[in-house]
From Swiss-Prot:
Mediates the import of long-chain fatty acids (LCFA) into the cell by facilitating their transport at the plasma membrane. Also functions as an acyl-CoA ligase catalyzing the ATP-dependent formation of fatty acyl-CoA using LCFA and very-long-chain fatty acids (VLCFA) as substrates, which prevents fatty acid efflux from cells and might drive more fatty acid uptake. May act directly as a bona fide transporter, or alternatively, in a cytoplasmic or membrane-associated multimeric protein complex to trap and draw fatty acids towards accumulation. It comes from the Eukaryota. GO terms for cellular component: endoplasmic reticulum membrane; plasma membrane. The keyword tRNA processing does not apply. GO terms for molecular function: arachidonate-CoA ligase activity; long-chain fatty acid transmembrane transporter activity; long-chain fatty acid-CoA ligase activity; nucleotide binding; oleoyl-CoA ligase activity; very long-chain fatty acid-CoA ligase activity. The keyword Transmembrane helix applies. It comes from Bos taurus. Keywords: Cell membrane, Cytoplasm, Fatty acid metabolism, Ligase, Lipid metabolism, Lipid transport, Membrane, Nucleotide-binding, Transmembrane, Transmembrane helix, Transport. It is a single-pass membrane protein. GO terms for biological process: long-chain fatty acid import into cell; long-chain fatty acid metabolic process; medium-chain fatty acid transport; positive regulation of triglyceride biosynthetic process. PROSITE patterns: AMP_BINDING. It is found in: Cell membrane; Endomembrane system; Cytoplasm. This is Long-chain fatty acid transport protein 1. The gene is SLC27A1.
C-alpha cells in the first residue's frame, strides 16, 4: 500500500524538528511533506477514495457483531427471534406462494411451525435428531424446518433435483431418522425405496396421486391438522452456536457435502445482506431460488423470519414470469444467482420491465460483461453482488455498486476483517509459503486463493464445516496468517485492486495453463456467451496425451443444430488471445446446471474430447487450415498419437 519507510521517516523528522525548537505547526507540515514525498501519497489517495465505503462497511460489521453477541448472551435461537417478529406484526404477510397464490401471515406461519414442533415432539423425536426434507420451495418448506427447529430437531435440506444413488447418498450421510417429502416428488422417493432403511419414518406432504404413497408412508397434512398450534410447553435448551439445519453443497466438483448451519450462521448471513444493502421492513422480496440452498433460504427467507419482510416464493425460476410476478406483488427487492440475469436478458422486451418497483437485486454470479446492460435495461438502481459459500467465514459484499466487484476488504484497516488472498501453485493449487512457513500474501492485481482466519469464539469468523470430518479438515490450513493459526480455504481465486475491491477469477481448478499462459474459464465463458446471444457455455481444460498443459474445450448449448463453428471462430479471433481460443468444441442440446444455476462441468471434464464418450457433435481447431473440423474416432486417435499438432 505504501513504502514502509514513509511513515517512519515522517515520524522521525517530526521528532527531530521539534527537538530543534521549531513550532509544532512547522514540524507537522515538514513531516507531512516527508511522508508524501516518501510514497505516502498513495495511502492518502486510497483513504480519500475509500473512506466513505469503509466506514459504511465498518458500521455494518459492528452492527451485526453487536446483535449476534446480544443474542448469544440471551441464548436466543432463530425460532425465538422469529417469535418476536410475530408478536410485532402477526397479521402482516410473511410468505406468498406465487405459484398457487397462497398467502401466509406471520401468525399462520407461526401456528403451522408450532404444529410441526408439537407433532414431532409427540412422535418421540428429540433435540439433536435429524429429519430430511425433500420438497419444492413453498411456505410449507419453511414452516417444516422452522417447526423442527422449535423442537430442537435438525433438518437436512435435500436438493430436489437429486435422484437414485446421489439422493440416497445425501439422505444416508445426514443420519436422518425421518424423511418428509412433497407429493410432487413421490416418484423420486419410490425409485430409491429399496435403498431406504426400514427404520426410516416417511411422511408425505401436499397433493399426491393414488399411487404416490407407499404402505409405510404417513400423510403429514392430516396429522398436522389434528395437532395443537400452541407453542411447545418445554422448548429445547438451544443457543446461537447450536445446529439449526444442514445444507448440501451444490456438487459442482463432486458429490455434495452436508454443510453445518448453526443458528448464528443463519443470522449472520441474513443480517449482512439486510444491512449491507439497506433493506427496510416495508420491502417485498422476490425469491425464486431453491430453498434447499443458502441464498434462497437464508439470504432470502431470513429477511422474513428475522426482519419481518414479506417474501414472495416461486418454486422454480421462470424468466418469462419474473417481471410479471414483481409487478403483481409490488416487489422492491429481487434475488439472483448464477446465470439468472443472463437468462432474463435473453428474453424479449416485456411491458412489465418498465412497470416494476424493484430497486435492488441481491445475489452472486452476475457476469461483469452484462452488469451494466442488466441495470440499464431493467432499471434496477442497485446491484447487491456478494461472494460467499454457504459454509465460509470470508464472505464479502459489494456495498457501493462497483461494476464487476464481488465485494471489498479495507486497505485502510485490513485487519478488522481477517481475510486475505494468498499465493498458490497455479497447477496444483497448493499454498505457497515463505521461509517462516507462513502463506505468502498477494499484492494488488495478483490473483490468489481467498482464505479467512478461523476463530471459533467469534460468530463472524467461526467455521463449522461439514458432517464429514474428513471433508472439514480438507478445507482448513494452518500457519496461514501467523504460526499455529487456522484458516478456511475457500477454493476460489480472486484478485484485489488498489482500492481493495475484489473480483472473482475462478474456482480452483478452473484456471489452467496452455502454451505457457493462464486461461481463465470465466473469461472465455463470458466472451463466448456474449457472442452467441447469452447461450449457455461451459469452458474447461482437457489433457491431451504428450502435450504440456491443458487444451481449452467449450461445451455449447445448440439445441437446434444451428451453430456454425467456423463463423464463431472468425469472431473469436477478434476478441480472444490465441492461447484462450477453444481447441475443442462440443455442441449439445443443453449444458447441465446445478439447482443454483451454476454450470456443471464434472461430467464434461471427465468425458473430455473422446467421441466414444458422447454422441454430441465434436470439433477440433486445425491451426494449419485455420478453422474447426469434425472430430471423429480416427481424428481422435491421430490427436492422441501426436499426428495432429495442436
Amino acid at each position: 500500500m505504501r513504502a514502509p519507510g514513509a511513515g517512519s521517516a515522517s515520524v522521525a523528522s517530526l521528532v527531530l524538528l521539534w527537538l530543534l525548537g521549531l513550532p509544532w505547526t512547522w514540524s507537522t507540515a515538514a513531516a507531512l511533506g516527508v511522508y508524501v514525498g516518501g510514497g505516502g501519497w498513495r495511502f492518502l489517495r486510497i483513504v480519500c477514495k475509500t473512506a466513505r465505503r469503509d466506514l459504511f462497511g465498518l458500521s455494518v460489521l459492528i452492527r451485526v457483531r453487536l446483535e449476534l453477541r446480544r443474542h448469544q448472551r440471551a441464548r436466543h435461537t432463530i425460532p425465538q427471534i422469529f417469535q418476536a417478529v410475530v408478536q410485532r406484526q402477526p397479521e402482516r404477510l410473511a410468505l406468498v406462494d406465487a405459484g398457487s397464490g397462497a398467502c401466509w401471515t406471520f401468525a399462520q406461519l407461526d401456528a403451522y411451525s408450532n404444529a410441526v414442533a408439537n407433532l414431532f415432539r409427540r412422535l418421540g423425536f428429540a433435540p439433536g435428531d435429524v429429519v430430511a426434507i425433500f420438497m419444492e420451495g413453498r411456505p410449507e418448506f419453511v414452516g417444516l424446518w422452522l417447526g423442527l427447529a422449535k423442537a430442537g430437531v435438525e433438518a437436512a435440506l435435500l436438493n430436489v433435483n437429486l435422484r437414485r444413488e446421489p439422493l440416497a447418498f445425501c439422505l444416508g450421510t445426514s443420519g436422518a431418522k425421518a424423511l418428509v417429502f412433497g407429493g410432487e416428488l413421490a416418484a423420486a422417493v419410490a425409485e430409491m425405496s429399496g435403498e431406504l432403511g426400514k427404520s426410516l419414518v416417511k411422511f408425505c406432504s401436499g397433493d399426491v396421486g393414488p399411487d404416490g404413497v407407499f404402505p409405510d408412508t404417513q400423510l403429514l397434512d392430516p396429522l398436522l391438522k389434528e395437532t395443537s398450534t400452541a407453542p411447545l410447553a418445554q422448548p429445547p435448551g438451544k443457543g446461537m452456536d447450536d445446529r439449526l439445519f444442514y445444507i448440501y453443497t451444490s456438487g459442482t466438483t463432486g458429490l455434495p457435502k452436508a454443510a453445518i448451519i448453526v443458528h448464528s450462521r443463519y443470522y449472520r448471513i441474513a443480517a449482512f445482506g439486510h444491512y449491507s444493502y439497506s433493506m427496510q421492513a416495508a420491502d417485498v422480496l422476490y425469491d425464486c431460488l431453491p430453498l434447499y440452498h443458502s441464498a434462497g433460504n437464508i439470504m432470502g427467507v431470513g429477511q422474513c423470519l428475522i426482519y419481518g419482510l414479506t417474501v414472495v416464493l416461486r418454486k422454480k425460476f421462470s424468466a418469462s414470469r419474473f417481471w410479471d410476478d414483481c409487478v403483481k406483488y409490488n416487489c422492491t427487492v429481487v434475488q439472483y444467482i448464477g446465470e439468472i440475469c443472463r437468462y432474463l436478458l435473453k428474453q424479449p422486451v416485456r411491458e412489465a420491465e418498465g412497470r416494476h418497483r424493484v430497486r435492488l437485486a441481491v445475489g452472486n454470479g452476475l457476469r461483469p460483461s452484462i452488469w451494466e446492460e442488466f441495470t440499464e435495461r431493467f432499471g434496477v438502481r442497485q446491484i447487491g453482488e456478494f461472494y460467499g459459500a454457504t459454509e465460509c467465514n470470508c464472505s464479502i459484499a459489494n456495498m457501493d455498486g462497483k461494476v464487476g466487484s464481488r465485494g471489498f476488504n479495507s486497505r485502510i484497516l485490513p485487519h478488522v476483517y481477517p481475510i486475505r488472498l494468498v499465493k498458490v501453485n497455479e497447477d496444483t493449487m497448493e499454498l505457497l509459503r515463505d521461509a517462516q512457513g507462513l502463506c505468502i500474501p498477494c499484492q494488488t492485481g495478483e490473483p490468489g486463493l481467498l482464505v479467512g482466519q478461523i476463530n471459533q469464539q467469534d460468530p463472524l469468523r467461526r467455521f463449522d464445516g461439514y458432517i464429514s470430518e474428513s471433508a472439514t479438515s480438507k478445507k482448513i490450513a494452518h500457519s496461514v496468517f501467523r504460526k499455529g493459526d487456522s484458516a478456511y480455504l475457500s477454493g476460489d481465486v480472486l484478485v484485489m485492486d488498489e482500492l481493495g475491491y475484489m473480483y472473482f477469477r475462478d474456482r480452483s481448478g478452473d484456471t489452467f495453463r496452455w502454451r505457457g499462459e493462464n486461461v481463465s474459464t470465466t473469461e472465455v465463458e463470458g466472451v463466448l456467451s456474449r457472442l452467441l446471444g447469452q447461450t449457455d457455455v461451459a469452458v474447461y481444460g482437457v489433457a491431451v496425451p504428450g502435450v504440456e498443459g491443458k487444451a481449452c474445450m467449450a461445451a455449447i448449448a445448440d439445441p437446434h443444430g444451428r451453430l456454425s463453428p467456423n463463423a464463431l471462430y472468425e469472431e473469436l479471433q477478434k476478441v480472444l488471445a490465441p492461447y484462450a481460443r477453444p481447441i475443442f468444441l462440443r455442441l449439445l442440446p443443453q449444458v447441465d446446471t446445478t439447482g443454483t444455476f451454476k454450470i456443471q462441468k464434472t461430467r464434461l471434464q471427465h468425458e473430455g474430447f473422446d467421441p466414444r464418450q458422447t454422441s454430441d457433435r465434436l470439433f477440433f481447431l486445425d491451426l494449419k487450415q485455420g478453422h474447426y473440423l469434425p472430430l471423429d474416432q480416427g481424428v481422435y486417435t491421430r490427436i492422441c498419437s501426436g499426428a495432429f499438432a495442436l
